[in-house]
Amino acid sequence: MSPRKTYILKLYVAGNTPNSMRALKTLRNILETEFRGVYALKVIDVLKNPQLAEEDKILATPTLSKILPPPVRRIIGDLSDRERVLIGLDLLYDELADNAFSSG
């Protein structure tokens, strides 16, 4: 069985708004359930760090970016749909493919 990949993610939020807090809570729940111990999440408040948002060309919040493993993927807006988040970031496909190959 191959070692699991490490996932590097960035979540861009705009302050402590209910929408930002909900996105963070939902994302942490997904990550702790599906990727415990194999992820790093950096939360960036674009109101406090506008230069980071500008450098990464973030135009709306919340935005979730998967940096590693490549390719970079982004989801903009509502993160409450677990399956949409996993598919949008190519995480669900990776995990299903790994399980299919390791079970045979």
Curated annotation (Swiss-Prot):
The keyword Chloroplast does not apply. InterPro entries: Circ_KaiB, KaiB-like, KaiB_domain, Thioredoxin-like_sf. One of its GO terms (biological process) is circadian rhythm. Keywords: Biological rhythms. Coiled coil: none annotated. The KaiABC complex composition changes during the circadian cycle to control KaiC phosphorylation. Complexes KaiC(6), KaiA(2-4):KaiC(6), KaiB(6):KaiC(6) and KaiC(6):KaiB(6):KaiA(12) are among the most important forms, many form cooperatively. Undergoes a major conformational rearrangment; in the free state forms homotetramers as a dimer of dimers. When bound to the CI domain of KaiC switches to a monomeric thioredoxin-fold (KaiB(fs)). KaiB(fs) binds CikA, leading it to dephosphorylate phospho-RpaA. Belongs to the KaiB family. Key component of the KaiABC oscillator complex, which constitutes the main circadian regulator in cyanobacteria. Complex composition changes during the circadian cycle to control KaiC phosphorylation. KaiA stimulates KaiC autophosphorylation, while KaiB sequesters KaiA, leading to KaiC autodephosphorylation. Phospho-Ser-431 KaiC accumulation triggers binding of KaiB to form the KaiB(6):KaiC(6) complex, leading to changes in output regulators CikA and SasA. KaiB switches to a thioredoxin-like fold (KaiB(fs)) when bound to KaiC. Has 2 forms, fold switches to a thioredoxin-like fold (KaiB(fs)) when bound to KaiC. This is Circadian clock oscillator protein KaiB. It comes from Parasynechococcus marenigrum (strain WH8102).
